């Protein structure tokens, strides 16, 4: 069971702390026996808060699609299993989701040509200031936003990356359109943190939700970096699986 203590002096609203704990309890299967979140009065007693605070937490979780109020019954869990996303030598979004979802969606939010900054230049092995193609994207499974990413590609080699991605909806296919038929994952760093305002909006999360951020580099088979990405996954919808 998830610890029910909330901290009144930690700078995070009580309802957000409670929403986090209920979200984790749902994820852990603590309420699976009934399929219902405990009554508001019970939650208020467990957390040591009033019912209004509990209602605010449940309303936030309802906005995420995690729970649903049912008249005369209480709050029902709309539990959807996390999809398992493998990180391996050949990491591909659509192949990674496999048969876990019926429909995979990708959206190009924006693109630009930008100069390589220090960290990104180092990751791609290019001098600072080198022109890069920047893509901002959101990916979903069965209509649920799963991740949002900002990715960078050497502009000299992948000049049409934005146009190809917009048309094909796939990084792998956009690479192939530039003559790159295969590429591999070189490195992946993973951190977990609270979602920022833009991520809450793009992933349709409530305040206090957690994202897992990966910073990754892909390279061609000769070892030349071709992509640097910063991807944020909704932690209550995706679990990352490291394959070696």
From Swiss-Prot:
CDD domains given in the database record: WHTH_GntR (cd07377)
GO biological process: negative regulation of DNA-templated transcription
InterPro entries per record: Bact_HTH_transcr_reg, Chorismate_lyase_/UTRA_dom_sf, CP_lyase_PhnF, Tscrpt_reg_HTH_GntR, UTRA, WH-like_DNA-bd_sf, WH_DNA-bd_sf
GO MF assignments: DNA binding; DNA-binding transcription factor activity
SMART domains in the record: HTH_GNTR, UTRA
Annotated keywords: DNA-binding, Plasmid, Transcription, Transcription regulation
Protein's name according to its UniProt entry: Uncharacterized HTH-type transcriptional regulator RB1450
DNA-binding positions: 40-59
Entry keyword annotation includes DNA-binding: yes
Organism: Rhizobium meliloti (strain 1021)
Record-annotated HTH gntR-type domain positions: 12-80
């Amino acid at each position: 069971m998830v610890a029910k203590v909330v901290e009144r002096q930690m700078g995070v609203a009580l309802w957000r702390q409670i929403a986090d704990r209920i979200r984790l309890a749902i994820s852990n299967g603590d309420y699976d026996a009934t399929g219902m979140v405990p009554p508001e009065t019970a939650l208020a007693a467990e957390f040591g808060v009033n019912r209004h605070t509990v209602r605010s937490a449940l309303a936030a979780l309802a906005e995420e699609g995690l729970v649903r109020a049912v008249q005369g019954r209480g709050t029902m869990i709309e539990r959807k299993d996390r999809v398992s996303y493998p990180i391996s030598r050949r990491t591909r979004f659509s192949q990674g989701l496999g048969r876990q979802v019926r429909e995979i969606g990708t959206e190009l939010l924006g693109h630009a040509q930008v100069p390589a900054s220090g960290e990104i230049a180092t990751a791609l092995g290019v001098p600072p200031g080198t022109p890069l193609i920047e893509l901002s994207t959101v990916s979903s499974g069965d209509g649920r936003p799963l991740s949002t990413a900002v990715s960078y590609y050497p502009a000299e080699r992948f000049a049409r990356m934005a146009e190809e991605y917009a048309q094909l909806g796939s990084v792998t296919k956009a690479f192939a359109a530039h003559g790159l038929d295969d590429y591999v994952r070189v490195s992946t760093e993973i951190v977990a943190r609270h979602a920022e305002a833009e991520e809450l909006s793009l992933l349709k999360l409530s305040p206090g939700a957690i994202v897992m951020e990966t910073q990754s580099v892909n390279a061609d088979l000769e070892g030349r970096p071709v992509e640097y990405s910063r991807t944020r996954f909704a932690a209550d919808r995706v679990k990352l699986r490291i394959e070696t």
